[in-house]
Structure formats: structure tokens, C-alpha cells
Amino acid sequence: MEDFFSIGQIINTHGVRGELKIYPLTDDINRFDDLDSVYVDNEIKKVISVKKQPNKLILKLEGIDTLDEAVKYKNKYIKVLREDAVELKEGQYFIKDIIGCNVFDENDKDLGEVYDVISTKNNDVYCIRKEGQQDILVPALKDIVLKIEIENKKIVIKAVEEWLES
């Protein structure tokens, strides 16, 4: 099974020539500039053009040339293969890789599993759930998140009592 990343959602059509209005699901809208092809509904589509608008993009894909054809793709996701994803800087991670990680504090106490990541203007927030306990929201800050081991699906954070008090 291929490993895909959703980078945008088709929210509507644009015009009558098969263009698609895209809501980007990436924090770097410029990543669309270098796309040669994308996957929509498990079909590979060549990118013909990309136009940027405030908070959205207009994408023209090969083989979608009419309004009727474009309508079929409404609410679908634009995806790329992991190998074609933007290369991250050290200390950056894909949300898809963070979700499912087990979280421990520095005393090796099991706090649960990351089930969601909330992206805010200042930083991400990891949503952690452990059965029978209240969910924990952890700001993804360097002084709180001490270690992330994606290959081991493990995150180590500062003891909750230490950072909740400050």
C-alpha cells in the first residue's frame, strides 16, 4: 500500500473549463508550485496550472476539462506520495506521523496516544487520549516536548505538573 499525504481538499469548481478550487491542508502553500502530478481518487493527474488566491488555490489538472467533469471531484482530496512530499527541516514532523505516537513523561509514565494535532497560529497542540482518563492537550513546544522518535512511535514530554503550573 502506498503512503499518501493529503495536501488539499477540492472545495468547489472554478469556471467552466474544469478548474478546481482547493483548500490547502499544508502550512506552506508554495509547495503547490513544484507539483508535477497529484493523486485524486487513486488516479494520478498531471498538474497543468496552479493559481493562488487568498486561503485557496485554483488547480487545473489534465483530463478534467469541463464543469461537469470537475463537479465529480468536489470534496475529494488532493494527495501526494510520501516520497514526493516536501522535505522537512530537522525537528519538523508530518502530523500524520505524530498521530498514533505513544506519549510518556520524562519519568516514563504512560500518558496515552496522540489522536489529533491542532494547528494554531503559534504552535501545534498534541491531543492525547488514554482510556479511563481525561484527555491531555500538550503544546508542541521545545521546552515541553523533549524527544520525538517517529520510528518508535514514541514522544517524551516534560512531566505535566511541571509545565501546567508555569
UniProtKB/Swiss-Prot annotation:
Molecular-function GO terms, alphabetical: ribosome binding
Protein origin, superkingdom: Bacteria
Residues annotated as domain PRC barrel: 90-163
One cellular component term from this protein's GO annotations in UniProt: cytoplasm
Keywords from the UniProt entry: Chaperone, Cytoplasm, Ribosome biogenesis, rRNA processing
GO biological process assignments: ribosomal small subunit biogenesis; rRNA processing
The keyword rRNA processing belongs to this UniProt entry's keyword annotation: yes
Subcellular location: Cytoplasm
InterPro entries (alphabetical): PRC-brl_dom (IPR027275), PRC_barrel-like_sf (IPR011033), RimM (IPR011961), RimM_N (IPR002676), RimM_N_sf (IPR036976), Transl_B-barrel_sf (IPR009000)
Function: An accessory protein needed during the final step in the assembly of 30S ribosomal subunit, possibly for assembly of the head region. Essential for efficient processing of 16S rRNA. May be needed both before and after RbfA during the maturation of 16S rRNA. It has affinity for free ribosomal 30S subunits but not for 70S ribosomes.
Similarity field: Belongs to the RimM family.
Subunit structure: Binds ribosomal protein uS19.
UniProt remark on domains: The PRC barrel domain binds ribosomal protein uS19.
PANTHER family for this protein: RIBOSOME MATURATION FACTOR RIMM
The name this protein goes by in its record: Ribosome maturation factor RimM
Organism taxonomic ancestry: Bacteria, Bacillati, Bacillota, Clostridia, Eubacteriales
Gene: rimM
